[in-house]
A protein has these predicted regions:
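Conserved alpha/beta-hydrolase
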Residues: 73-93
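Catalytic histidine-centered segment of alpha/beta-hydrolase-like enzymes
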Residues: 284-297
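Catalytic nucleophile-loop/oxyanion-hole region of alpha/beta-hydrolase
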Residues: 30-33, 63, 89-124, 128, ...
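The serine-hydrolase catalytic nucleophile loop
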Residues: 59-72, 86
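N-terminal cap/lid segment of alpha/beta-hydrolase-fold proteins
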Residues: 22-48
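Alpha/beta-hydrolase-fold enzymes
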Residues: 140-215
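Short beta-strand element of the alpha/beta-hydrolase
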Residues: 49-58
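Short beta-strand/loop motif that positions the catalytic acidic residue
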Residues: 247, 253-255
């Protein structure tokens, strides 16, 4: 097995934080091969044609949640950042709503990279990707073999394969039942939508889960707070490890043993080549990675160091 380089958080956090204090945020619509996608562009002030990072977030989320948090931190360090709403989420309209479909989302990310030439004031030839949580796998698949992308990173990676899925979702039989419910929902006459997160509704996708149920964190007006039951079919059968051995981009995984599924990151590293490295931060939970300042800053510092080494 090819040995993986493990970069320490201290060594990674060498780039000066908050080097560019002022950020300009512009709302735009990208006309892409998958349709119109609502996007926000974060531009560091007084930086001419900066490199650009496409930032994506956790499952069910919109561009104003943790993607915005990381976009702001990247802009403070001299990078432009583009966040966007996937088809059927937030401001990006589609007949299929709130569907967590990995293959659709991978296609959306690829389409955004291919449309960066529509964004003024950036250097689209220096494009990078950053996926947070569930979209880590989507981002890694979207950049594989993609000539529009230089390098990519993932923060709080949710990189599941079949074994991780079975462990998280109650075993093989439970997973099979959820997949079948998803398939039935996809073929039903009406979309089957449930609440995304709640402190009172035990049938919600994420009952009593931090961040998503907190108004000063992820429970914001822009968020759909909804989940299409049909999502189970694609989400639970998606294998983020399937392409690890073929990954051809310089990749950094910013992880912690305290996050949701560290086993998924270890498994991906075991299958990938030396171009995939990891930073392991101490005692950072999944939700801390989303918006706790010291943890977001440490993760951003590591990501920026990685991108700078691949300019």
């Amino acid at each position: 097995m090819v040995k993986k380089a493990l970069v320490t958080a201290i060594a990674a956090a060498t780039f000066a934080s908050n080097a560019f204090a002022d950020t300009i945020v512009k709302h735009t619509t990208l006309n892409t091969e998958v349709g119109d996608l609502a996007a926000n562009v974060y531009l560091p002030d007084n930086v001419e044609n900066p490199p650009v990072v496409v930032v994506t977030g956790a499952w069910t989320t919109v561009k104003e949640q943790m993607p915005a948090t990381y976009a702001e931190h990247l802009a403070e360090q001299g990078y432009a950042a583009v966040t966007f709403d996937f088809r059927g989420w937030g401001e990006s309209k589609d007949k299929l709503k709130q569907l967590e479909d990995p293959q659709r989302k991978i296609a959306d990310i690829k389409a955004v990279f291919a449309s960066l030439d529509q964004v003024d004031g950036i250097d689209a030839s220096q494009a990078y990707g950053l996926g947070v949580c569930a979209s880590s796998g989507y981002m890694l698949d979207a950049v594989l073999g993609n000539e529009d992308v230089v390098a990519a990173a993932a923060v709080a990676p949710w990189l599941h394969d079949r074994s991780v899925v079975n462990a998280v979702y109650g075993g093989a039989e439970s997973v099979a039942n959820l997949v079948q419910s998803g398939l039935r929902a996809l073929t039903s006459d009406e979309p089957q939508i449930i609440e995304g997160a709640s402190l009172t509704n035990q049938s919600a996708l994420m009952y009593n889960v931090p961040y998503y149920t907190e108004k000063d964190r992820g429970l914001i007006p822009e968020w759909d707070n909804a989940f299409n039951v049909g999502s189970w079919a694609g989400w639970l059968t998606y294998d983020a490890h399937a392409t690890a051995a073929q990954q051809d981009k310089p990749i950094l995984l910013v992880a912690s043993e305290a996050m949701a599924i560290p086993a998924g990151t270890h498994g991906y590293l075991d299958k990938a080549g030396d171009n995939v490295e990891a930073v392991w931060l101490e005692n950072v939970s999944q939700f801390d990675f989303y918006d706790v300042e010291k943890d977001v800053q440490a993760a951003t510092d590591a990501v920026v160091t990685h991108f700078q080494s691949n300019l």
